[in-house]
Amino acid sequence: MDDKQFVVVLALPMDSDDAWIMVKNKSRGWEFPGGNLRTGEAPEEAALRELYEETGILGTAKAIEESLMLGGYVVLVRVEREVSPDPWISSDDSIEEAGWCLQIPESSAWGKEEIQSVLDHDWRTSSSLES
């Protein structure tokens, strides 16, 4: 029985690994998009749903990793949105704004090492979601 309860989304542009999307949670600060799995929901489905709910962006799930987060999955998602320094407003009431990051924000909800471990992960070693 799989006991993982949540997903974290590493959303990258289609053609680069130099920028990623984070959301500024009103109570926790900057973090990767993500949230709890719903009953019967596959991790990649939850990742795409959470990404859309928190950022308004659609993407394509490319790979999944089970070992990066205790109790959760990290899903690599590629998005067709141009990298821009301008943040945008989320329709999720708990999210102040969403935006592209080129470096780890100071007011992050997670430790810098934890964020860096997700950014540095070698996705070639993870389970591919591509056919």
Residue ranges: model-predicted function:
Residues 1-20, 73:
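Conserved N-terminal beta-strand and adjoining loop/helix that marks the start
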Residues 37-131:
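Unchanged
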Residues 17-22, 85-87:
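Short, well-ordered strand-loop elements centered on a beta-strand within folded domains, enriched
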